[in-house]
Swiss-Prot record:
Disruption phenotype: Deletion mutants are unpiliated but nevertheless form biofilms showing that attachment and accumulation of cells did not depend on pilus expression.
Disulfide bonds listed in the record: 127-163
Propeptide stretches in the record: 1-7
UniProt-recorded name of the protein: Fimbrial protein
Principal subcellular localization: other
Glycosylated position list: 70
Keyword field: Cell adhesion, Disulfide bond, Fimbrium, Glycoprotein, Membrane, Methylation, Phosphoprotein, Transmembrane, Transmembrane helix
SUPFAM superfamilies on file: Pili subunits (SSF54523)
N-methylphenylalanine carried by residues: 8
Organism phylogeny: Bacteria, Pseudomonadati, Pseudomonadota, Betaproteobacteria, Neisseriales
Residue numbers carrying O-(sn-1-glycerophosphoryl)serine: 100
Biological role stated in the UniProt entry: Major component of the type IV pilus (T4P) that plays a role in cellular adherence, microcolony formation as well as twitching motility.
Annotated GO biological process: cell adhesion
TM region(s), chain numbering: 8-28
Length: 170
């Protein structure tokens, strides 16, 4: 008796399921990194929106703005986005803090900074891990890595290549 088999055998189905599982295991971490980078890009975009106000304040007053109000921008809690809790200007350093909910777990509550230094009569901007500047006075361009930033730094793999400057960059 010759029977004609139609469809897939159990072994064939198990092999297909195993292949799909392996592909999902490889793709999921890459997707998580992609979503974190996309969320960090919102923080950079909001922080970069404050650069012109900080630069203008510096060029007009000869010192860095001490806070959001003196820079002429909205308060830190008013500058926010879907993934960004706040953007603060302090002594010319613009720091964005990620939100603590609806954000990739690897970047929850973490920070990044944009800061400027005088260079040949103009202002050059840098972007990277959180930094602080002690004083707003024009003679002080130095920034230091934020002391309380341990555990609050965004992993370098989630920062775009244009935002990986060290605090001692010049």
């Amino acid at each position: 008796m010759n029977t004609l088999q139609k469809g897939f055998t159990l072994i064939e189905l198990m092999i297909v399921i195993a292949i799909v599982g392996i592909l999902a295991a490889v793709a999921l971490p890459a997707y998580q990194d992609y979503t974190a980078r996309a969320q960090v890009s919102e923080a950079i975009l909001l922080a970069e929106g404050q650069k012109s106000a900080v630069t203008e304040y510096y060029l007009n007053h000869g010192e860095w703005p001490g806070n959001n109000t003196s820079a002429g921008v909205a308060t830190s809690s008013e500058i926010k986005g879907k993934y960004v809790k706040s953007v603060e200007v302090k002594n010319g350093v613009v720091t964005a803090q990620m939100a603590s909910s609806n954000v990739n777990n690897e970047i929850k509550g973490k920070k990044l900074s944009l800061w400027a230094k005088r260079q040949n009569g103009s202002v050059k901007w840098f972007c990277g891990q959180p930094v602080t500047r002690d004083k707003a006075k024009a003679a002080n361009d130095d920034v230091t890595a934020a002391a309380a930033a341990n555990g609050k730094k965004i992993d370098t793999k989630h920062l775009p290549s244009t935002c990986r400057d060290a605090s001692d960059a010049s």
